[in-house]
């Protein structure tokens, strides 16, 4: 059986990267939430 997680740096960055987050209003909310929580890493 093929595993579900097939890593790809490009896909990872495009869907979960910092610029992808900044591109939408809700993505910016995600970053704000993670900053408020004190996350060391904000995005992938």
UniProtKB/Swiss-Prot annotation:
A single BP term in Gene Ontology: translation
InterPro entries to which the protein is assigned, alphabetical: Ribosomal_bL34 (IPR000271), Ribosomal_bL34_CS (IPR020939)
One Gene Ontology cellular component: ribonucleoprotein complex
Top-rank lineage group of the source organism: Bacteria
Gene Ontology MF term list: structural constituent of ribosome
Keywords: Ribonucleoprotein, Ribosomal protein
UniProt record similarity statement: Belongs to the bacterial ribosomal protein bL34 family.
Protein name: Large ribosomal subunit protein bL34
Source species: Idiomarina loihiensis (strain ATCC BAA-735 / DSM 15497 / L2-TR)
Gene: rpmH
